[in-house]
Amino acid sequence: MLETVCEIFKEAYNRGWITARDGNASVRYAEQNYFYITPSGVRKQFMQPEMFKKIGINEGYYDQPPRRIYTHEILEYTDVSANLRPSGEFPMHFGLQKQITQPVRVVLHMHPTYTVAAMYKGINLQSLLNEFPELSRYTSIAPTVPEIEPITQELADATMESLEVHKGYVKYDIVGYDRHGVVAVDTSPWRAFEHIERLEHICKIVLSAK
């Protein structure tokens, strides 16, 4: 799985969806109380599986009022990983990985050119669902998250609200960050990648027609 994520970053870099140190991803299997996340500051086109950070998820409960709480810890993984820090978008990945209960959950964050350009021009990404059947059939688009400072808890909270994560399920496949990028969620790296690819293709068509 991690090897596949590395392949995806090479593909995203070759397509111009990210520059060398952009983008991030995380992977978790439902039965595991940990997940893997890309490190900060690494050239993503040269990502290797041993570079990922391994993050433990600890679950607890409060009685008053009754609610679950989650904490995290960095776990040992590889010697290479030990010298790296988790992605700056950790709050967003942790927020999604601790709540979604799909058997496998993959979260990809990229900066696809035409999709970001479409949002910059004020195009409502959700409105494209009604105009292009390949979107409405295969990719559900969440309401765009307004411009929020990256690598913040505020952005993480807005992401979960827009994707409508509730009782372990996520309603949408992809969400746009205004003037920033997108986050796609699915059960495999390539399925998440295809949501980004599909939306990017449609945005390119729309912008070319204007």
Region annotations inferred by a language model:
Residues M1-K210:
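Glycine-rich flexible loops
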